[in-house]
Amino acid sequence: MSTPRSDPAPVPPREPTRTSRGGVLPTLDDPVVAGASELVGGPAGRRLLVESRWWTPLRVCLLFAALTTLVFGFGAKEHCRSSGWVPNNMYFHACYSDVPPLYSGRGLNQGLFPYVHSDAVLAAHGVYSQVEYPVLTGMLMWVEAKLVPGDSKDPFTTYFDINLLFATAFLLGMVALTALTARRRPWDAALVALAPAVGLAMTINWDMLAVVLLAGAMYAWARDRPALTGVLLGLGTAAKLYPALMLLPLLLLGWRTRRLGPVGAVAGWGALTWFNCNIAFVLVNFEGWKEFYSLSQSRPAGFSSIWYVLQINGHGFTPLNTWASGLTVVLFLAIAVLALKAPRRPRLASLTFLVVAAFLLTNKVYSPQYLLWLVPLAALARPRWRDFWIWQAGELVHFFGIWLYLGQYADPKRGLGDTGYTWTVLAHVAGTLWLAGIIVRDILRPECDPVRADGLDDDPAGGVFDGAPDAGPAAVAEDRPAVPVAG
């Protein structure tokens, strides 16, 4: 049996872009940041000594995140906060949020505990739907509702503000975890902190909980803690199903490096954690617990999915579940082939981004807050401002487009029609495909990968895969015995 060889070094390595402490300086690493730095005196010198004990990269990124929340998370929603959560306000001022309507729509304002009541009990309280999210999200909704003072003059806005505080805490955690996961590249977390689409989308729903849990799982894996990774993935999956998708990249890289033991530990701890989060609700009221899963199975093509756009343009697909699931599986298989056949072992963040992006592009619905799922993964997978902002631009076009499209039902004269809306969805799809395509290019040509290009890093978020021997195509080719040539 041949012995696996280490990953080939990228060629040619460029001059390291580091400070005295080993951190990458963005003005020496990213062309966009270098160009922008000319406004304040140009890029940092090669001998710059960064010794500030207070304004560390992490603290600066956290300040950026706080400003993003203030301007976009709070400021952009101020019209709805002051004028009411009604369709004309929410759609035409782009301040829509699910949070205030569901406060009463799911009985949270009456103190009803999610999932445990029968439909008859809910109906007696004027509530006609179970909470349609996984249990950890439902628990967050309930906790936030319990924090609303009983004498609040505007409990709906108070509930929104409480959710904003939770979302802000999750954003700060997401930024910190991204910076720590990136190791020598803490400034990459500024991509997360300064993304306007994050500020705009963070209060639409409760997705930030799952996003920060997946960011925590990435950090735990980077620190070689598979049990903690599994627990955080289990919690994330109990809040939103998508964090479980990280298991596919882990499995592929575990197979390629022959290090499947830690991957099995992640899967085991994740399954146990998810089970413990759910079992009580299953036993108390199975019908209430399964609402999320039943809705996911039965729902038709939802707003902003490729299936909805095809449908409104006269190209419906039936049965939709088969088409959507089939296309998802095809893309996952393509990613698996890429992971196993690439000339050098791909990085974990790169594969995780591709898997989540594939799921989002083929899913039956694409809500505007789903962009949050990709943001920390994008910062780790492709830490380049140009590509990140091309993707963000597409998401911003879609963000405003979906509200104008929904606004036509409140005021047809001001709303956006099918054609205009189709173009905004295509902007989101094109932006996501652009970033995914660049990441695929980096996998096929590792010398183009910003993280690996200076020859100092392999896979900072890779945990046991970082610097591991590679049993991929390059190693196989080197181990193959030479074919004798007849003389």
What is the predicted role of each segment?
Residues 2-289, 325-487:
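Multi-pass membrane glycosyltransferase architecture that uses lipid-linked
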